[in-house]
């Protein structure tokens, strides 16, 4: 039985040779019968191999993996870690064993000759760690290393040590270099095949008759069954009877064995006779010579062992630099320095030198000697040095730009665009081997320096590129097939273009700061370039947190609309715009969109309602969402001016406005620069605007009050149709992103001493649509005077309202009997003027939710409390307003019922204050211009049925002078309203009254705008243009105000002893700085009600007894009134100025003539702002007995002294009304009430005299007299993107 070895060529090759058993003496003469030890083979050890590079390689892709059949690294005999690596190339795979030091050697060779670490991204292998777990720590590192290397390895590997590490030759065949491999075992005999044999096992050899086999192992003579030998590169077993050994001295005619018996192969007779006749040379010298010639190593083997040194010219660049230890070739360094010093001559690198000088220089460099270039021979023949330099690069086996990167360079240059081409070429250069990269950089910088001397050498960059291109870049495919004709010219073109591009951009391509990060594999930029600050935003001011949140919320509302401002137009475009050309700016922003931001960039002007004489605009669908967004308060110059960049953007969906402590009343001075910044920003914006017909329209609608331009309508929002719009004013359209609140700014009442700029009778030019610059002192809350200035203008007239039944029940449920206390009058002697608030929303009739009822009841309970007669409420600060009637209203209401409750409570409070004012006998100050009023209350409530007793009232009413006492359940509401007015810190206002200078220009006729006829048609109240343009006034002390010009009113019913003191100290207002107030979950409701100022008529009287708890059942519960006595003194100027009567009142029906003053002109109506914000406050029954009402949860100041309570609600003395149906999503409006100026007269039983009440449209009640000659009050309601106007 013969043992077989598993050693074969396809095996690992590192196993030991299995010896065959020996039973006797040697079977071959002179050869022992034991196992032959494997001597040192012809291949050196891996560490002993000299560094060399193959000239040509073609093996394709190589895959390297840690051997999967090995569980982990093992320890070799030298106690070093050994890892198994599976190498796969050209479909064949074999394992190799390598230590960790071998891995580090491979990494060093790779990054010294093949790759740069910036391109390969391979980590440098650290020294081997110490400890027992070193193997487990190195396995993940080597796995990642081999995986990354497999993705990089291609036919670009020409380094001999690297391929030897993988047991590869330059053609992808396995190269066995192990010393103990069976292929390296020397043979003991040679034999030729005499019998054909086919292998029956993988470790057997197959051969044919006549093949030569080298025998490496033979058993004894007695056992001749199996021998082991080599045939070609295969090692295996074969039967011994199939071969015959060659003998050293064969016999004549036969080739016999040494033992005597012939092998049976006869020799030819002619050959044997010939060989026997020629004597063979014998001797030791002849044998040595024959042995040397047979075993002469090849050139490649001599290079591996370091015996043969490659010359400089024709040697691989990486090999030469590795053997010489230099960064760049010595030939290049010496030649470039010499040429830069002496070679600035005409035709350098283009002309050729003397051939003998070139060969002599080459021999010097090949002999590793540096020639003396400064000799006279070379100084006279400088072109020989330049020719030698080109010769060196031309004879490189692999050109400087390598064969492998020829196609990539060609593709990079075909990319369109200079910048992208630069990036692509830079990426290709990074793939060069480090020796090539360093040499290319050195050569290109040298050629770039020579190109700067093109005036002396006539060799600019293009000429140098044409001369050097064939020496630096070549294609292996074109050289192998032999190109000619068009292909040759095409290659020259590609070569010259690439080299010229490298010469032109050498400083950029080889810069350390140049990077292609952020680019995709194709070289396209993935990261957008940041725009310049001046081009991306108009202001360099940092945004506040609120502004950023508002902008973010606005962008979330419209994800499809870009909100990033575009870069401004170029200077040429701006110059074209100044010359009058229609230049479309990027982003669609222009000066006109600054006024129309809230209404959208393409929303046309809406037409008036049908009952105003116009055509109705198509109503908005009820299910549609308003295309607006809530704007927060703008509290500074920066916040006003920073939003001009948002003009022209798409409307954003309205979001929930965050509550703050500045929602209701101001208690501190407002920033002085607010209005000025707005005016200045508008003026600066107008410098680049273009004049068009729409400019006058925008200016008249948005800035008519400030600029004095003519107006086309009398009401602020009469031209909005029935589509409710709560966008900001047109002049403040740029403030959309700031959550702007129109009620923030207030202006103080005018002072008689302040001069008003007279208005020119001629209409202003349409182009001057921007307001004049306003000084901070003109809009200061307190004016330039001392703090003793009078209080802000306030509403103190009776109010007839229409309240839904649900609100009336809640108001009645929250009341309880309590003693009434007087309220100090804010303006002594002010005439009482009625204001009508019709309920215009159909949704107001809907029942309130439980949460709303609880809020209202709780606030009504918490606001009541006994007030002493000696206590007085602090005066509210003078308001400031930058709004005009032409501006857009505040955000849309969310709950009409809560709105009405707010308005009723505030009106009742003002009426009570007016009563106390008249009881004191004071004279109301005279106002010279109309003003706009703002109400902002927060009313809470409790569920129905939680109140004490008494039926719920139907409306909030103020008793007349004949009423002995107020109802017991109303003081709470008045207390609540006064409390809220007294707790607002200064500087935190979000509501504001409108000052005299903000009167809309549409209310002044006579002007020349193109909308003047339309304004006259839309507005029933037109005023002449001779009215002086009011300016910004500051309040003056009360004693400076002139008395009323009319008959004084009789005193109203006193709620208590008068406690008003004209010389009372000014209230102390706390700073707005402090802990933030808790946010209110209630919704804010805003209304503006514009009514004619100075109405000298009194409110309707009641036909029932003032002591009755409920009005008669025949009265409609949807209407309410506030009784008021006629004035006792002469009315002020602005109260005696009325516009002409509307067309709805025929002249023959006007039985009452209002007093007119010849020197006064009619004034526009004033809007009434109403804000309702209900907070989630629970009922507090104990608060009714407290001496001081509790502070509002959103207030940051002290509650202040107690305030009186509200008067009793009453019903209006008429029957059920017929609703006026109006198509639209919000339902029909309520009929309006008109009053006569005659004092109220009650008959027996409190019956109302006939002829004291009127309805709108000229409809009279039973026995009604003619309507008054003044126009009816005007209302305009904005909600959910729609607007309704009433007159």
Swiss-Prot record:
Omega-N-methylarginine modifications at: 1244
Name one process (GO BP) from the record.
small GTPase-mediated signal transduction
Task: Give the intrachain disulfide bonds.
Answer: none
**Record site feature (Arginine finger), residues:** 350
InterPro entries given for it? PX-Rho_GAP, PX_dom_sf, Rho_GTPase_activation_prot, RhoGAP_dom, SH3-like_dom_sf, SH3_domain
User: GO MF annotations for this entry?
Assistant: GTPase activator activity; phosphatidylinositol binding; protein kinase binding
Q: Where is the composition biased (Low complexity)?
A: 558-571, 672-709, 813-829, 896-919, 1175-1189
**Family statement:** Belongs to the PX domain-containing GAP family.
Gene name, per UniProt, is ARHGAP33
The name on file for this protein is Rho GTPase-activating protein 33
Highest taxon of the lineage: Eukaryota
Region annotated Disordered, chain positions: 1-40, 551-792, 813-832, 859-1030, 1056-1075, 1090-1134, 1146-1287
Q: Where is the signal peptide?
A: none
Q: How does it assemble?
A: Specifically interacts with CDC42 and RHOQ/TC10 through its Rho-GAP domain. Interacts with NEK6.
Summary of the function given for this chain in its UniProt record = May be involved in several stages of intracellular trafficking. Could play an important role in the regulation of glucose transport by insulin. May act as a downstream effector of RHOQ/TC10 in the regulation of insulin-stimulated glucose transport.
Ranges in coiled-coil conformation: none
Where is the sequence biased in composition, kind Pro residues? 752-766
Q: What are the entry keywords? A: GTPase activation, Methylation, Phosphoprotein, Protein transport, SH3 domain, Transport
One Pfam family from the UniProt entry?
SH3_9
Indicate the segments forming the SH3 domain, all copies. Answer: 186-248
The annotated regions of Polar residues compositional bias extend over: 622-645, 972-981, 1019-1028, 1274-1287
- Amino acid composition bias (Basic and acidic residues), ranges on this chain: 572-584
